[in-house]
Amino acid sequence: MLTTTFDSGLICAPVTPEIANKLQLPQMVIENADPKGTAYTVSVDSADPSVTTGISAQDRALACRTLANPSAQPSDLRRPGHIIPLQAKSGGVRERKGHTEATVDFCRLAGKQPAGVIAELVEEGEVVEGVAEISGNNGMMRRDGCLRFGRKWGLKVCTIEDLVEYLERTEGPLASTAAAVNGKH
């Protein structure tokens, strides 16, 4: 997986509230103190007998495919695990302008099950005396870095702003653009 090479190591799987409820994925904590309001649920692995530790790229990919399977049941997942599902707001980026909601909106627009996979990309740093050099963004890749990464690897890159603009153009104005929470994940 490209993500396991260039990300922070934390792979998340945005899902709709309906999927989270169907698969019995409760919030990780009762009182969410995340500054961006990211709705982390309990972590999962696939319950498929082929899964070993759950940490391999194959095991994590299977957990993500299970979350996106419309036929999946709660018993198809083990808890805790190595993938963290994130519960999107019902209104998508119309309600919260975060990566979680954008992922679910992209899946919906593609005609797919509203469950995706995201990971925070990190800036490449030099290792000096065993310590990674970190940029001013705590090593996290921001907009310009993501655009460069996309060009380097031949990947299409779309910003949340691009998605909002597209939705306004094709589905009408957002109900309350100013009221939408500006999230991160």
Question: Which sequence ranges carry the predicted segments?
Answer:
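Catalytic domains of riboflavin
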Residues: 1-185
